[in-house]
Amino acid sequence: MGKTRNDDWRKVNYMEIIPYESRYAEDFRLLNEAWLEKYFVVEPYDSELLSQCEDIILKPGGFIFFIRIDSEIVGTAAYIFKSKGVYELGKMAVDPVFQGQKLGQKLMLFMLEFAQKNHWSKIILYSSRKLKNALYIYQKNGFIEVPLEPNLPYDRSDIKMELNLK
């Protein structure tokens, strides 16, 4: 099948960034469980999101994207709908075998462009100061630290960041 103009937005160098399809649900779960288990534990809310991503992320208005190299899914990120124009960036992971190739940065740039094209007002995220590389990418892309609210969705979170798009 030939390349169409609509495919251009997905191409980033040698990789493709593609939207969610149900056949990639297991990749979404496994990629995220790998980094969660490496640095933390898989919390109950994580398990819900990862095992029911269509119901909890997509149906309420969220989005999931994947990095595909050849036919292999090697990275993912999600936007979780919070309120009109406000989304939480989360569940961002790159397979350890493919880390160090700036795939996370390329995925982040795609995610930011997607938010801007959709005229969102704000992106929020929750992270941990333990994830220095992730925090560097967030700060490099304009995210700033904001106060944490009570009743956080994740026990591991000790930092909240946001990026105002308007």
Language-model-detected regions and their locations in the chain:
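Conserved glycine-rich acetyl-CoA-binding loop
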Residues: 72, 95-109, 118, 129-136, ...
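Acetyl-CoA-dependent GNAT
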Residues: 19-91, 95-97, 105-110, 114, ...
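Intrinsically disordered, low-complexity regulatory regions of eukaryotic regulatory proteins
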Residues: 5-6, 86, 156
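Conserved N-terminal entry element of GNAT/NAT acetyltransferase domains
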Residues: 1-23, 165-166
